[in-house]
């Protein structure tokens, strides 16, 4: 009986939890809820490119093939890819990027959920992750094109739009 009283008194301290983590998660969610899936993927790719230039250098061809929807993201990606392909050293690239793209870099760091994932990963793991993100981006981009073509077909049915839609859908199914 005495033991029960002791546990009861002690339980009052256990109930007083720190809700700071929950609050931080809510704030992050509020910031990210306005971002589409494709924007989050863009930020994730840019985060890896910005923080792992060696990995980005190995993926120059794949990175130059994709075109981001957001102009500012596309400009940043192009600036980094161009600098890497010209053979500029990391310090020059970082200085150039940090001076011209401060606002977007801050936004990427605030909204990129990939930071925790890459924290303790090897360069090989990060390279694989970048491959997956690029593939996801291409799929999302194709889905967007399909949606837009379907909408176009609904508005006016023409053979060219229909054949392009079929081609895109079959390409998506193959991947």
Whereabouts are the PLM-identified features?
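A charged alpha-helical hairpin associated with nucleic-acid processing machineries
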Residues: 1-175
């Amino acid at each position: 009986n005495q033991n029960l009283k002791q546990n009861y008194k002690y339980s009052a301290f256990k109930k007083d939890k720190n809700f700071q983590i929950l609050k931080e998660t809510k704030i992050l969610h509020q910031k990210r809820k306005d971002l589409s899936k494709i924007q989050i993927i863009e930020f994730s790719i840019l985060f890896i490119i910005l923080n792992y230039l060696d990995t980005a250098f190995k993926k120059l061809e794949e990175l130059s093939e994709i075109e981001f929807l957001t102009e500012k993201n596309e400009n940043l990606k192009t600036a980094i890819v161009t600098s890497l392909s010209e053979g500029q050293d990391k310090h020059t690239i970082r200085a150039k990027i940090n001076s011209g793209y401060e606002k977007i870099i801050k936004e990427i760091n605030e909204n990129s959920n990939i930071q925790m994932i890459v924290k303790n990963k090897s360069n090989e793991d990060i390279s694989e992750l970048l491959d997956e993100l690029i593939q996801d981006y291409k799929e999302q981009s194709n889905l967007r094109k399909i949606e837009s073509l379907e909408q176009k077909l609904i508005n006016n049915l023409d053979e060219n739009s229909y054949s392009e839609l079929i081609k895109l859908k079959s390409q998506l199914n193959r991947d």
